[in-house]
Design a protein with these regions (language model features):
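Short glycine-rich substrate-engagement loop in P-loop NTPases that contacts/grips substrate
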Residues: 53-85
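Interdomain motor-coupling "hinge/lid" segment immediately C-terminal to the ATP-binding subdomain
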Residues: 128-247
């Protein structure tokens, strides 16, 4: 299964300023597979350590963090010689042994020749729990579920993914039905690697749903296992409210939908926990269109999206038959699925700040507004081919952005500074 992140790993390997690498991401987005596959493809040997199931290695890191001593201990455990130039050293579930995280500082300072990649499903939480963390001594890589282009490649449609990257929109339009059909499948299957692999091999939607149910059950178990006891009920209520939050026309998060009378201060910690786990994307409001957008962030107003569109459909009980009814998929629960999909694709784009906009009166709302570092692009999301976008026009008149995007099921079209970008090509937004 091809992952675009593999190219980033290869650049890391070849960098002269390489530091130990930490891969962040939710459980079951493919971190372990990616690290092992990277070692298989680009190294002579790979030594894999899972700190969640290896007490001996936990003991090794419990005392002296001298790098020569640690390497010797790993060699004795694995029975293999670690060659700095040709061996990839993988630390998995590294959050389980905080001193293993701390050791990365010493590897960077005293033994930078070693190639070390780390990951942990709950790493974000560990970083907020007082763990001694090697600030400035490590590189980071965020891994998300498969994007739509990665889904196309996994489903045997590599040339279609390549065509999107080339942005040959006249040719893309000629094959738009293939893209639309694949997009409907992606809305159901999502991008969790196990679900995508199953679909690619068997085309069985029922099997995909069972996999998604197991993933959701595993997340629920994580709530009980890893979250502080006092916030577990709040995490569950908040998590289960997300489909109904997104089903509303105004998708701003409302605490009252979690529990009647709920207030922000009661659930802030639960939101932070889910965000640190990588299970939700918190998209904050901005009230202006200047660079950098973060300067205009309103931390009190936000939308919450799930990590994956397929999991959202599973939680909402979206049925397989919806896929067979023409464009009905984009009518039933259309706003939620479409905005979730767009958010998910935008989050996979490196160094892209993602927000949403409303003016202070609430009379103008832009579904997403993104900061590329060079320009701010407002993004209006339409589930079907309806191209009316009153708010987008109002925003353009006020802030005169270089380009504005309306993404829908309609074909690519550019008129002055307004671009209609097909939903299946939204990953290309930073390349416009």
């Amino acid at each position: 299964m091809y992952r675009i992140a593999m190219e980033k790993l290869l650049k890391w390997k070849e960098s002269k300023r390489r530091k130990p690498l930490i891969i962040e991401g939710a459980r079951q987005v493919g971190k372990t597979w990616l690290m092992k596959e990277f070692g298989r493809l680009y190294y002579t040997d790979t030594v894999y350590i899972n700190f969640d199931s290896n007490s001996r290695m936990a003991e090794l890191f419990a005392s002296d963090l001298d790098t020569e001593r640690l390497i010797m201990g790993v060699e004795l455990y694995s029975g293999r010689k670690i060659d700095p130039d040709h061996t990839l050293l993988i630390f998995d579930e590294v959050q389980e042994v905080p001193r293993a995280l701390s050791s990365l500082k010493y590897f960077y300072e005293n033994a930078p020749e070693y190639h070390i990649v780390c990951a942990g499903s709950l790493l974000g939480i560990a970083l907020h729990e007082g763990t001694s963390f090697p600030v400035g001594k490590v590189d980071f890589l965020k891994l998300f579920p498969l994007s739509f282009k990665e889904f196309l490649m996994a489903a045997g449609k590599e040339r279609y993914a390549e065509l999107l990257s080339k942005q040959d929109y006249p040719m893309i339009t000629s094959f738009k039905q293939t893209y639309i059909d694949a997009l409907k499948q992606y809305y159901f299957v999502g991008g969790m690697p196990e679900a995508v692999q199953s679909f690619a091999e068997n085309k069985d939607f029922n099997e995909v749903r069972e996999i998604q149910k197991r993933i959701l059950a595993a997340y629920e178990q994580d709530f009980s296992k890893h979250a502080p006891n006092e916030i577990v009920p709040k995490i569950r209520m908040l998590w289960n409210s997300i489909p109904s939050q997104l089903a509303r026309e105004n998708k701003k998060f409302v605490y009252g939908l979690v529990r009647e009378g709920a207030r922000a201060k009661d659930y802030e910690t639960a939101i932070l926990w889910l965000s640190d786990c990588g299970l939700v994307h918190k998209i904050s409001r901005v009230n202006a269109g200047g660079i950098p957008l973060k300067a205009y962030e309103d931390l009190k107003a936000f939308k919450l999206f799930l990590v994956d569109v397929g999991l959202l459909g599973c939680m909402a009980g979206l049925r397989q038959r919806t896929l067979l009814d023409g464009n009905d998929l984009f009518v039933e629960f259309k706003g939620a699925l479409t905005e979730q999909y767009v958010c998910q694709q935008l989050k996979t784009i490196e160094d892209l700040g993602v927000y949403y906009y409303t003016n202070d009166r609430g009379s103008c709302e832009i579904d997403f507004i993104v900061d590329t570092g060079e320009q701010v692009i407002p993004v209006e999301v339409k589930a079907e081919t309806n191209l009316r976008a009153k708010s987008l026009k109002t925003y353009q008149e006020k802030f005169t952005p270089e380009i504005a995007v309306r993404t829908s099921m309609a074909d690519f079209k550019k008129e002055d500074r307004l671009v209609n970008l097909p939903l299946y090509a939204v990953e290309q937004i930073a390349e416009l």
